[in-house]
């Protein structure tokens, strides 16, 4: 049986070679691994060493990426390649390059599918010996029970030998109820060594690239498997030695890694909490950060067709109950902006404004409204501005025609520092950005937020806000001009008479 194993790498060729040598050492003629090697922009030296070894020792396909696109995207590229090239294969796997496998690791994974006559089991993963603590992970030790505690000297080989001789069940199975009960505390089956039925990717899609470089992506995909009525298993006698975080440590310090982990976990919990129960297709949302804005009661509410979500890091707001808003605590959410940044709280709100795709997976359309915007009309009608040909509708500014005029107005009204305004003005001039581009008023955004093009444009817009100015209207038109984005501009006069009104100026003042 030929089994494709997706292996993403970035530098760390010594670890990759150690992993590949262990696979070679424990080859089983009945389970032939084919390595789908996806290199994430490593140096030529690193790639050549791995290529040389693979050519002489293992069956493989190689995919070279020009730059590091992150673990998740690299895995998805490998999965799609393998599924297209080898469409008849029943199983496919993912492995990390910082693992060592052990005797029968692959056989023991596949064996856990054999009693599943209804194809309900879609994913089986290995136990993890964590070389950083010279022990099994606490979660995996609990799965095995007391017998494993009799090991006198903690090392990988002794654990493998001990567990191989245990008279115990082949696997432990997990389902949807496990995730519902523990609120995503556990991944259950991490993806450092895992086998899937290939059919699962046609059924529920691929790994969620909204988790960027990695962490919580495996928890999210496992949840999706179980949410769709399938189960996952952990193979008790398939054991790998895992270093963990090896690629991340090349890129970031420990504090940054911790922040990425915590943010992704928080994102996962919020996303699933918001999406698992609602049957509605549309959401209206906002974010109140610090004292920049305040939440208002809307004049026109339609709870039949919309959910209403307010993200906030404000302790005062978290204590309130304001109809129809469901208030979501995001105090601990990390947006990769330093707390010392004087614009932190404004940029915090901007993050949620530009990233609905991270939280509203099951909603088809979203309407963002700034905290000072009131709804006065029927927003079910407003949704019709989106059609098959556009993914974003936004008001056109009623007074100014272009970004350069907006820069001047921001300076006159004191809405941004002169230094930042000068920097973005010079940047736009150097980019040859044209003057007549119909400046937008971004207090209201209507989007098909899960559209791939929309996600791309929102990410680019966020980069501009992070690097230049908190005033998002100073960068929207540039981003859509630069990257060929398309949007529908709606006259603000039309919207303000029919759907929206402004209750107060930003900052919470009348």
Residue ranges and their predicted role:
Residues 45, 99-112, 373-384:
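Acidic donor-binding/catalytic loop of UDP-sugar-dependent glycosyltransferases
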Residues 1-52, 276-349, 362, 467-471, ...:
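N-terminal anchoring/stem segment of glycosyltransferases
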């Amino acid at each position: 049986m030929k089994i494709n194993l997706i292996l993403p790498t970035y530098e760390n060729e010594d670890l990759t070679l150690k992993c590949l040598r262990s696979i070679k050492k424990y080859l089983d003629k009945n389970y032939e691994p084919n390595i789908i090697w996806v290199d994430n922009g490593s140096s030529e030296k690193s790639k050549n060493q791995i290529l040389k070894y693979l050519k002489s020792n293992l069956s493989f396909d190689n995919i070279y990426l020009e730059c590091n696109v992150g673990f998740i995207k690299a895995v998805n590229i490998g999965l799609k390649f393998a599924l297209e090239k080898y469409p008849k294969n029943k199983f496919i796997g993912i492995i990390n390059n910082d693992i060592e496998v052990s005797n029968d690791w692959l056989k023991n994974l596949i064996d856990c599918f054999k009693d599943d006559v209804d194809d309900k089991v879609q994913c089986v993963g290995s136990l993890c010996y964590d070389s950083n603590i010279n022990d099994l992970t606490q979660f995996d030790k609990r799965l095995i029970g007391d017998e494993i505690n009799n090991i006198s000297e903690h090392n990988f080989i002794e654990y493998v030998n001990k567990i191989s001789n245990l008279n115990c069940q082949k696997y432990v199975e997990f389902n949807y109820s496990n995730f519902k009960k523990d609120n995503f505390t556990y991944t259950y089956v991490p993806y450092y060594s895992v086998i899937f039925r290939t059919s699962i990717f046609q059924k529920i899609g691929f790994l969620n690239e909204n988790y960027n470089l990695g962490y919580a992506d495996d928890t999210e995909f496992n949840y999706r498997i179980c949410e769709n009525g399938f189960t996952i298993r952990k193979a008790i006698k398939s054991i790998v030695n895992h270093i963990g975080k090896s690629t991340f440590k090349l890129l970031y310090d420990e504090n940054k890694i911790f922040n990425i982990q915590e943010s992704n976990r928080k994102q996962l919990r919020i996303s699933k909490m918001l999406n698992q129960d609602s049957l509605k297709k549309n959401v209206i949302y906002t974010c109140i950060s610090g004292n920049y804005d305040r939440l208002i009661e809307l004049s026109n509410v339609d709870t039949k067709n919309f959910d209403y979500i307010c993200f906030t890091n404000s302790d005062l707001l978290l204590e309130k109950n304001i109809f129809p808003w469901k208030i979501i605590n995001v105090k601990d959410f990390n947006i990769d902006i330093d707390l010392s940044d004087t614009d932190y709280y404004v940029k915090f709100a901007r993050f949620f404004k530009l990233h609905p795709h991270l939280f509203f997976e099951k909603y088809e359309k979203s309407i963002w409204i700034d905290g000072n915007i009131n709804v006065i009309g029927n927003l079910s009608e407003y949704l019709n501005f989106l059609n098959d040909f556009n993914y974003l509708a936004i008001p056109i500014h009623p007074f100014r025609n272009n970004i350069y005029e907006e820069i001047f107005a921001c300076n006159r009204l004191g809405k941004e520092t002169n230094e930042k305004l000068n920097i973005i003005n010079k940047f736009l001039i150097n980019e040859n950005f044209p003057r007549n581009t119909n400046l937008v008023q971004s207090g209201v955004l209507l989007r098909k937020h899960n559209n791939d093009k929309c996600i791309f444009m929102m990410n680019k817009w966020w980069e501009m806000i992070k690097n230049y100015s908190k005033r998002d209207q100073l960068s929207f038109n540039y981003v859509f001009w630069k990257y060929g984005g398309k949007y529908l501009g709606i006259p603000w006069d039309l919207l303000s008479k029919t759907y929206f009104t402004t209750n107060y100026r930003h900052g919470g003042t009348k």
